[in-house]
Amino acid sequence: MYYGFDIGGTKIALGVFDSGRQLQWEKRVPTPRDSYDAFLDAVCELVAEADRRFGCKGSVGIGIPGMPETEDGTLYAANVPAASGKPLRADLSARLDRDVRLDNDANCFALSEAWDDEFTQYPLVMGLILGTGVGGGLIFNGKPITGKSYITGEFGHMRLPVDALTMMGLDFPLRRCGCGQHGCIENYLSGRGFAWLYQHYYHQPLQAPEIIALYDQGDEQARAHVERYLDLLAVCLGNILTIVDPDLVVIGGGLSNFPAITTQLAERLPRHLLPVARVPRIERARHGDAGGMRGAAFLHLTD
C-alpha cells in the first residue's frame, strides 16, 4: 500500500492507495504548529493506524509546502513552523523504520496528474497552479524534476516579460513580491492577482469569485477583464513553454475552476511561441483536493 501525506499549515491529510492507484482510506488531523515532537507523533500515529488497518507496512510519501535543503536535509516550510528547519525526512524514516520520501506540494500535485490513467501517455507533464500563489512542477517519465535547489517549477517567481509590459503599458506597476523581488508573475496571475488587476483597472475591490460571477452574467467590464487576464497569462506561459516544451499542461488551484482558463488559453498561445512550436494539450486538474495525497503516495512509484 502507498501512504500519501498532504501536509499544510492547518491539516495533515493521509490517503492510502492500492497498487492500482485507487484511494482506499483517508483521514485528517490538525497540524501541530509549535511542537516538532507533536508534529512527528501526529504523522507516526496516522501511519501506525494505516498499518493496522491494512495489515502491512505501507510506503510513506509526504507533500509539504516547502523545499528540502539539499545540503543538510533540513526543510524550509514557512507555513508549517513546527517542521521548518528540521531534518523531517531523516527523522520520520528512523521512527517509522522505512524509506520516507518527501517533496513539495506543487510537485506532488503535478505527479498526481501525470499518473492519471488518461495522462500517463505523455512523457513530459507540466503542472501549473493558479491559486493563492502561482507554482507548479515538471514530471518527466513519471518522475519529478526537482533541480539542484528544489526550485524547479517555481514559475510564479519569474518576472513579467517585456511583451507583458508592452501589452499592459510601460508604466504598469511592478509589485513587490514576498520573495523580495519586483514584478513576479504570481502577483498578477494568482487568484489574488486576478482580483488586483480588476481593482487596478476598474477601482473596485472585488474578489475573484465575484468577478467570475459577473463574467458569467455577461457583465462587459468583467468580460474585458478576463480577456486581459488571459492575454497576460498567455504571454507569461509562452515564455515557460518555450523553455520547457511539455506534452501536457494541467492547471490546478482555485482559478482552474473557471472554465475560460482552460478553454480559451490555447488559442492565445501561438503568437507567443516559436513558429515551429506546437501548443501542448491544456487540461484542468482531474483530482482536486486529493491530488496532494495522491502525488505524495506516488513518490514511491518513481523507482
Curated annotation (Swiss-Prot):
It comes from the Bacteria. InterPro entries: ATPase_NBD, N-acetyl-D-glucosamine_kinase, ROK, ROK_cs. GO terms for molecular function: ATP binding; N-acetylglucosamine kinase activity; zinc ion binding. Keywords: ATP-binding, Carbohydrate metabolism, Kinase, Metal-binding, Nucleotide-binding, Transferase, Zinc. The keyword Metal-binding applies. Zn(2+) binds at residues 157, 177, 179, 184. Its EC number is 2.7.1.59. The keyword Transferase applies. HAMAP family: GlcNAc_kinase. Belongs to the ROK (NagC/XylR) family. NagK subfamily. This is N-acetyl-D-glucosamine kinase. It comes from Escherichia coli O1:K1 / APEC. The lineage of its organism: Bacteria, Pseudomonadati, Pseudomonadota, Gammaproteobacteria, Enterobacterales. The gene is nagK.
